[in-house]
UniProtKB/Swiss-Prot annotation:
High-level lineage: Bacteria, Bacillati, Bacillota, Bacilli, Bacillales
NCBIfam families: PRK03634.1, rhamnu_1P_ald
HAMAP family linked to this entry: RhaD
EC category name: lyase
Essential cofactor(s): Zn(2+)
Protein name: Rhamnulose-1-phosphate aldolase
Localization terms from the record: Cytoplasm
Length: 273
């Protein structure tokens, strides 16, 4: 007999994270989406994986993820409602063997669907798993100050990254590889998914200009913390600029010393020798 899925750690983690994202104002209305790669062992504790509720076609070749299980936020769902009604706003899905569809095993009880950004998420999972087999989470949100920076700051990866590194001491330690930036593209398309996943091969943070940010990590906490750290730096930058601009900041020599102390190396070419 399977356990009650409402007691599953992965459901509780997702509910808590979506609530925090809404509380912080990073996922207004139905903005934002999360996909959480699950281990089969943890899924079968709560679900009979042979009991398929319905099959949902995809306009994307997901064969590289065939057979894998994911907990996914629903299309058009409000993050503020997840904690009170997980079964309506979330779904546990399995990618079909041919990669052309997903099987719904639990959730979306109002006949809902997975997030419209599923192709971008799945492409990002494929990219991250190719360089980090332990990657489990892809998270998209509209982090306010990072979003604002895309209107006022130079949109080159090196300069954007350097500014974030210089605003908070912990930034270099948390994301030494920097942030990736794609052009503005229509959301919910394979095109934006392909652009994002290409950047995901080298970065865990991808900025969507005038829209939001994508983050990836080994756990829900790691991924949330990654975005949270970059957003804090962007907030500090916003405050600094409103106070008259930068008069002093963390120097490149100090950033190098920081990297040496914490065993991380800044992306090649981003610091001045």
């Amino acid at each position: 007999m399977t356990k009650d899925i409402m007691d599953a750690v992965f459901i509780k983690e997702m509910a808590k994270t979506t609530s925090n994202l809404y509380r912080l104002g990073w996922d207004e209305r139905n903005g934002g989406n999360i996909t959480y790669l699950l281990d089969e062992k943890e899924v079968v504790e709560y679900l009979d994986v042979k009991q398929i509720i319905r099959t949902i076609p995809m306009d994307f070749d997901g064969k590289k993820l065939a057979g894998k299980y994911f907990l996914v936020t629903g299309s058009g769902k409000y993050f503020k409602n997840v904690e009170e009604a997980p079964a309506v706003n979330l779904g546990v899905i399995q990618v079909s063997e041919d990669g052309k569809a997903v099987h719904l095993l639990w959730g979306y009880t109002d006949s809902g669907l997975p997030t419209s950004e599923l192709p971008a998420h799945f492409m990002s999972h494929i990219a991250r798993l190719s360089v980090d087999p332990e990657n489990r989470v892809v998270m998209h949100c509209h982090a306010t100050h990072l979003l604002a920076m895309t209107f006022t700051h130079e949109l080159t990866e090196r300069e954007f990254t350097r500014t974030l590194w210089q605003m908070c001491t912990e930034c270099l330690v948390v994301f030494p590889e920097g942030v990736g930036i794609i052009p503005w593209l229509v959301p919910g398309t394979n095109e934006i998914g392909e652009a994002t996943s290409e950047k995901m091969k080298e970065n865990r943070l991808i900025v969507w200009p005038h829209h939001g940010i994508y983050g990836a990590g080994k756990s829900m906490d790691e991924t949330f913390g990654l975005i949270e750290t970059a957003e804090k730096a962007a907030e500090v930058y916003t405050i600094v600029m409103s106070q008259g601009g930068i008069k002093q900041a963390i120097t490149d020599e100090q950033l190098k010393a920081l990297g040496e102390r914490f065993g991380v190396e800044a992306k090649a070419g981003y610091l001045i020798n």
